[in-house]
């Protein structure tokens, strides 16, 4: 038990909570911790002792936990989103006082954060919704943090988060005050949506290299390790290289080949796609990555479908195509990078659309800066995004930034070769294909949408605009078409 009041408290000691608490303590801030399951409290206290006698103090009941923290109190919650958050707030509120601050560090739906901020304000409490990215390793050694809500609440923890967040040599701590309301949770949600896209694109690169190029796991390990030294340098490419190098400890071969091809999810990707639809922001790369996870979940159905089509002469790979491995690796690298630009462009445009709708005033370049370290999507590429928004804060789309436009033009031939090769081989590349379609649609001055609008006017009298005259028009297409047939 702490003799002096601690600087901060943390409730919820699953992996993320434990590691963040230890990180805070290691940075010199005495911390009180609490969990409903008391064994987790004892486990965390024991870890603190083993990891350097850190100033971390455990409590088995909420009252003594709250009262151990210096005023105005700051308590971070890291519990499952939804009703567990409401229950934790209710439990803690019984002992909090006016001016105390609650910080939700989980992946919460942004409107829940806004609701809770208003609700606790009635008791005089402050509230923050703070996205935390980086997984268990990031939480322990320095995550990217996205706090939004009460600015006064943020100032109460600013000294802590500036030290606890990941530190990037050329751009500082990976944390900033995001904005009002649920902006912090919304930004973290879209971060996760971009993460879905990134992971899917990397998986497709792997599939093409393995299924068409016949690269071994050793070769894949080498390729991804090389990629991580260039424009694709990132956490996800780094861990992908690691994965290909790990042997199975329960049998022969590599572990990656024994992992069931069925991807789980926790909901933030789905939320991102739903918000994109609600705001009419095209996000096909992120959407396709979500659909890919849904399809992966249909494992039993896919097993049966494979039998049906194999009986009809369709194997996993339609044709074995002779390819130049070196050329293929280079083409796939370029296709992955170009697709990645599209995925980030979609995510940034979604954040901007929500910021405009809610009046948050979010700075997209600053978001790219705090994602450069600690988080799952951290990448050297984010420096380029920050520079793009520094050049033009009103940039309509990353695709039309002069530097990114030049890079896409240089890579688009390789991008098309990879997508065509995959299609001809019967390999699905939904992320790369969707990214390419997004690019081709966005760069074309005229799309076939004129025909779709004409059809809508034909059957529903929805009217249309003309290219040569201002105004709204309706044509009796059916009547004219029938008269012309007489």
From Swiss-Prot:
Organism field: Arabidopsis thaliana
Null mutant phenotype: Embryonic lethality when homozygous. Defects in pollen tube growth.
Name the UniProt record assigns to this protein: 6-phosphogluconate dehydrogenase, decarboxylating 2
Entry keyword annotation includes Ribonucleoprotein: no
GO MF, one example: phosphogluconate dehydrogenase (decarboxylating) activity
InterPro entries: 6-PGluconate_DH-like_C_sf (IPR008927), 6PGD_dom2 (IPR013328), 6PGDH_C (IPR006114), 6PGDH_Gnd/GntZ (IPR006113), 6PGDH_NADP-bd (IPR006115), NAD(P)-bd_dom_sf (IPR036291), Pgluconate_DH (IPR006183)
Reactions this protein catalyses: 6-phospho-D-gluconate + NADP(+) = D-ribulose 5-phosphate + CO2 + NADPH
Keyword GTP-binding included in the entry's annotation: no
């Amino acid at each position: 038990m702490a003799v002096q009041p601690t600087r901060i408290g943390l409730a919820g000691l699953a992996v993320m909570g434990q590691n963040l608490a230890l990180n805070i303590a290691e940075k010199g801030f005495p911390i009180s911790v609490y969990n409903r399951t008391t064994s987790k409290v004892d486990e965390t206290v024991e870890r603190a002792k083993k990891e350097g006698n850190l100033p971390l103090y455990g409590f088995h009941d909420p009252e003594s936990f709250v009262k151990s923290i210096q005023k105005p109190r700051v308590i971070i919650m890291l519990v499952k989103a939804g009703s567990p958050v409401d229950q934790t707030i209710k439990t803690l509120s019984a002992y909090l006082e006016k001016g105390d601050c609650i910080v939700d560090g989980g992946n919460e739906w942004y409107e829940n954060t806004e609701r809770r901020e208003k609700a606790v304000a009635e008791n005089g409490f402050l509230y923050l919704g703070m996205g935390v990215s980086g997984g268990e390793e990031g939480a322990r050694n320095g995550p990217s943090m996205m706090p939004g809500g009460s600015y006064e609440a943020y100032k109460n923890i600013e000294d802590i988060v500036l030290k606890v967040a990941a530190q990037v040599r050329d751009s500082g701590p990976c944390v900033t005050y995001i904005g009002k309301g649920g902006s912090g949770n919304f930004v973290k949600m879209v971060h996760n949506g971009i993460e879905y896209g990134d992971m899917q694109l990397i998986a497709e690169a792997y599939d093409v290299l393995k299924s068409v190029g016949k690269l071994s796991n050793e070769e894949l390990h080498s390729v991804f390790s090389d990629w991580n030294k260039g424009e694709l340098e990132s956490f996800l490419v780094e861990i992908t290289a690691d994965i290909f190098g790990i042997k199975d400890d329960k049998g022969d071969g590599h572990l990656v080949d024994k992992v069931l091809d069925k991807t789980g999810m926790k909901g933030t990707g789905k939320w991102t796609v739903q918000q994109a639809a609600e705001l009419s922001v095209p996000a096909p790369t992120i959407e396709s990555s979500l659909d890919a996870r849904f399809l992966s979940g249909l494992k039993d159905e896919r097993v049966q479908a494979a039998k049906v089509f194999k009986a009809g002469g369709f194997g996993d790979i339609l044709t074995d195509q002779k390819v130049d491995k070196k050329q293929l690796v280079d083409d796939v690298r370029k296709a992955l990078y170009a697709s990645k630009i599209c995925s980030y462009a979609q995510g940034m445009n979604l954040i901007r659309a929500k910021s405009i709708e809610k009046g948050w005033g979010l700075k997209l370049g600053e978001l790219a800066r705090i994602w450069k370290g600690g988080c799952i999507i951290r990448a050297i590429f984010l420096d380029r995004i920050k520079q793009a928004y520094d050049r033009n804060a009103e940039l309509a789309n990353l695709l039309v930034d002069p530097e990114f436009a030049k890079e896409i033009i240089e890579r688009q031939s390789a991008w098309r070769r990879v997508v065509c090769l995959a299609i001809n081989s019967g390999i699905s590349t939904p992320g790369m294909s969707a990214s390419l379609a997004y690019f081709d649609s966005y760069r074309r001055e005229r799309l076939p949408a004129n025909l779709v609008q004409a059809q809508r006017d034909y059957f529903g009298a929805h009217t249309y605009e003309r290219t040569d005259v201002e105004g709204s028009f309706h044509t009796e297409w059916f009547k004219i078409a029938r008269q012309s047939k007489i």
